[in-house]
Amino acid sequence: MAAGIVASRRLRDLLTRRLTGSNYPGLSISLRLTGSSAQEEASGVALGEAPDHSYESLRVTSAQKHVLHVQLNRPNKRNAMNKVFWREMVECFNKISRDADCRAVVISGAGKMFTAGIDLMDMASDILQPKGDDVARISWYLRDIITRYQETFNVIERCPKPVIAAVHGGCIGGGVDLVTACDIRYCAQDAFFQVKEVDVGLAADVGTLQRLPKVIGNQSLVNELAFTARKMMADEALGSGLVSRVFPDKEVMLDAALALAAEISSKSPVAVQSTKVNLLYSRDHSVAESLNYVASWNMSMLQTQDLVKSVQATTENKELKTVTFSKL
């Protein structure tokens, strides 16, 4: 134990000297090392099918260490969102949120397109033949359905792990609701985005009208897309800020999305997940409120051993991917 204490003190002194330097003799930094080697074990997750995720409408694989790949998996139906999908997405992302081995997620569509949106044939009975004896009861029934469908994409936004949408082909209707709940969006050159709901006689009600204005920051463009249901092609999506990168085809895009997820997963999970929480809070609150929130947040997060490990790697010119961070 004495040897361990001495080693910790030596590391603290080393970091303090490296960080402060001779130009700032009055600056002192207090760093603590906690935990044991048992807390720092590398993840033993095998690549391939994720055993805890078995679904009808989704396929979940361990694409790389700490990275899960979620595919919308109804290619013969253009990945249309049926009743099973709405339930399984909630189950899937609730599991991912609790998965200490997962640090980043990529979501894509199998087959020729990302998604055709809501499967109207499968869901017609819920929408066109709602249950209830009178207007009040029918209204409460429909409201319950709408809020449950909203939860399908809320769980993506709430997931503490960054979620990267990789879009090819059509991203129609509910697909726009889905990707606007993600943290990062990539697309292939053949992608297009379409707020389709107005063409089927309703207002989008599971996230697009609430999130898209904040994603692209252009209310006039949002109004145009929502009122007309016109297609937004890949280059326009890039110019508007809906996506951050466009790639020649699906294969190149998926490789890039998985590489990005791997890079994110190499960082401190405490830092990454804290960053996501604070970015979402800041989106919906004032600067003053958000600064106060992050101050309260970091009063505990600054005590993480991830800080010490990251600083040590930096001072020793090591890449962060060589650092083993504890599970979170």
UniProtKB/Swiss-Prot annotation:
UniProt record, GO biological process: fatty acid beta-oxidation
EC code(s) of this entry: 5.3.3.-
Coiled-coil region: none
Catalysed reactions, semicolon-separated: (3E,5Z)-octadienoyl-CoA = (2E,4E)-octadienoyl-CoA; (3E,5Z,8Z,11Z,14Z)-eicosapentaenoyl-CoA = (2E,4E,8Z,11Z,14Z)-eicosapentaenoyl-CoA
Positions of modified residues (N6-succinyllysine): 231
PROSITE patterns, per the entry: ENOYL_COA_HYDRATASE (PS00166)
Keyword Acetylation attached: yes
Binding site for substrate: 116-120, 174
Sorted UniProt keywords: Acetylation, Fatty acid metabolism, Isomerase, Lipid metabolism, Mitochondrion, Peroxisome, Phosphoprotein, Transit peptide
Assigned GO CC terms: cytosol; extracellular exosome; membrane; mitochondrial matrix; mitochondrion; peroxisomal matrix; peroxisome
Residues the record lists as N6-acetyllysine modifications: 327
InterPro entries, sorted: ClpP/crotonase-like_dom_sf, Ech1-like, Enoyl-CoA_hyd/isom_CS, Enoyl-CoA_hydra/iso, Enoyl-CoA_hydra_C
Family annotation (SUPFAM superfamilies): ClpP/crotonase (SSF52096)
MF terms (GO), sorted A to Z: delta(3,5)-delta(2,4)-dienoyl-CoA isomerase activity
Feature: transit peptide: 1-33
Quaternary structure and partners: Homohexamer.
Entry's family note: Belongs to the enoyl-CoA hydratase/isomerase family.
Family annotation (PANTHER family): DELTA(3,5)-DELTA(2,4)-DIENOYL-COA ISOMERASE, MITOCHONDRIAL, ENOYL-COA HYDRATASE
UniProt protein name: Delta(3,5)-Delta(2,4)-dienoyl-CoA isomerase, mitochondrial
Higher taxonomy: Eukaryota, Metazoa, Chordata, Craniata, Vertebrata
The encoding gene: ECH1
